[in-house]
Each structure stands twice: as C-alpha cells, then as structure tokens.
Design a protein with these regions (language model features):
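P-loop (Walker A) phosphate-binding loop of NTP-binding proteins
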Residues: 8
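ATP-binding Walker
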Residues: 11
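ATP-dependent small-molecule kinase phosphotransfer cores
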Residues: 25-79, 163-165, 170-171
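NTP-dependent small-molecule kinase module
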Residues: 125-171
Length: 171
C-alpha cells in the first residue's frame, strides 16, 4: 500500500519527493495526477487555488489502481493509504518560504494558520491508519528524505503525532 507524503503547502513535500525519487522510490505527484485527469475544479481567485472534489478524486484514484510507493501532495492523506507522513514547518519560516515564492498574502495567511492549528495532521489522523510527522524547519531536504525512509523502514520513534507543537505561535 502507498504512503501519503502530505503537509501544508510550502513545507517541502515536492523537494523531498524529488530526492526520494532519486533514491529509487516510485512517486506520484498528486497535483499533476489531478490536473491530467481533469479533476481540478473552479479556481478560487482570492485564495489562488483550485477546488477539488475529494470523493471524485478518491474514486478516480481507486479505479486506476495505481501501484506507487509514495503519493505526494497536500491532499494525499485523503486517499486510501496505510500511512501518512505529515511534513511540518514553523509558521514564521513557512511564511517566509511562501513570500519568497511570490504567493498572495491571503494564501500565505490561510496556509500559515492551517499549519499553526495542525489542520493537515488532524485530517490525516482521521483518514489514515498510521500517521507520523516530521518537523522540516531546521532540516535539509535530504535529512527530511532520510527521516521518511526511516519511517518506511519501521523506525518511527520520535515521529509520532503530537511531537510538533506550534501552540506558542498562537499567543
């Protein structure tokens, strides 16, 4: 069964998945999958994002019965996966990453808030059998990729849900 590599936009999923691909893992870019199959809905101009019908996404994915090691994308934890690895990043660092990419203020605020309140982690815990999290804030992408490999190999200590806490950022 596939593993979801998920997290708030900007935490490093795509960069880490490219490293894992070079290390021999079969990676599915979920955003590309959605685009190629016409599963992106209306574009929300204010949020600079596309709407996605999650039920339709799941049905199309299951129908295709793809065999991949890792599904990368901020919606990947909504698919039928045994394990979700949630990449996390300290909100101030995440905000700077998004600014450097030229993202709109509203999109930055929405995603930083989602990271602060553990939105993706909570969703993943509701939809996946096993969930682990990795704080990418001070790690190089290759180190994050190695942590993902540790989890795949069964070395999960220190990656349990709740090990990353941004509640101080809310004060």
């Amino acid at each position: 069964m596939s593993i979801a590599l998920t997290g708030t936009p900007g935490v490093g999923k795509t960069t880490v998945s490219k490293i894992l691909k070079k290390r021999g893992y079969d990676i599915l870019d979920l955003n590309r999958f959605l685009k190629e199959r016409g599963l992106l809905g209306e574009k929300d101009i204010h949020r600079d994002t596309f709407e996605v019908d999650l039920e339709r996404m799941k049905k199309v994915f299951e129908k295709e019965n793809l065999k991949v090691d890792i599904i990368e994308g901020h919606l990947s934890h909504h698919l039928s996966v045994s394990t979700a690895v949630v990449l996390r990043c300290a909100p101030p660092v995440l905000k700077e990453r998004m600014k450097s990419k030229g993202w709109k203020k509203e999109k930055i605020e929405e995603n930083v808030e989602a990271e602060m309140i553990d939105a993706i982690l909570i969703q993943a815990m509701e939809t996946s059998e096993e969930v682990f999290e990795i704080d990418t804030t001070e790690l190089e992408p290759s180190q994050v990729a190695s942590s993902v490999e540790d989890i795949i190999g069964g070395k999960t200590e220190g990656y349990e849900p709740g090990t990353v806490d941004w509640s101080d950022e809310l004060l």
